[in-house]
Amino acid sequence: MNPSASPLWRIQTVATHAGKAFTCANVRQRAWARWVLGLLLVCLSPTAQAQNELYQDPTLPTNRKITTTARMLGISRAQVLDTYLSPEHYTGPDIRYISQTQREREGRRLSQLITHTGNVAYLKNRAGSGNEIAGMYSFDYALHYGFDWLDHRLQLQVGGRVETHVGFIYNTHNSNNPAQARVFLHLAPSAVASYKFRAGSIPLLLRYEVAVPLLGVMFSPNYGQSYYEIFSEGNYDHNVVHTTIGSAPSLRQMLTVDFPLLRSTVRLGYMGDIQQSRVNGLKTHVYTHGVVIGLVKRFTLIKLAP
């Protein structure tokens, strides 16, 4: 019997030719894929190189807006004295939220610093026989002019800021005149110093911020004057008072360090807020010292100059 005439042999022959054809087709497809991929790489390489040059070439004119935000929580110890409410000192925990936004442009020395602060404190006197609750919202706007040294690692920003404060102190023990309103506006020279360095392989940013009010205006009842007389009877008695560094010596400062943690930047440090005034025969001071911790984010917007 002729093996070439066998049906089984014919099936094997057809399968062999089909396998060879399939293999050849795969080889051709892979060859075409290599050619197409190579062509794409050749076409895209100049474009990618041009884009890299566009964003990395320092000679190209750019106008980048840089925004740095910090959201912090502060836990402090507060001491409050308001002789309109009580001659006693009250102390207790203070919790505050601080939101800071710094806006600047690359290549320019002017920058803006906007700060929102809200805090509340629960206080007791030394005998434990009386309580006070104090709260305050503050909005600060600062305009600074910057200097830098050591290849931009050391920076100093100096200028001034406007501070607005609205708050209260409530004495739970008083039946007559139980609360005191705190409303004032300050003009203060301010400064921010920062230094970039490394601890081993960890990049760190040490930052110090300070402001000292020089001039301002504040609301205050006069000695022995009730709020009923002011607002119900309309008896004005020098209740809007001009202040200076002599009558209202105050200081606000913050010393922090920024460091990377996982994929975030953490800010940790000390916060001190000293507010004092002696007007209309009344003395007030609020001393707050504590720890702040929060997150820092930095955003950069790139706009090509025409």
Predicted features and spans:
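Transmembrane beta-strands of outer-membrane beta-barrel pores
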Residues: 74-81, 118-124, 162-170, 210-218, ...
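Residues on the lipid-exposed face of transmembrane beta-strands in outer-membrane beta-barrel proteins
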Residues: 75, 95-105, 139-147, 160, ...
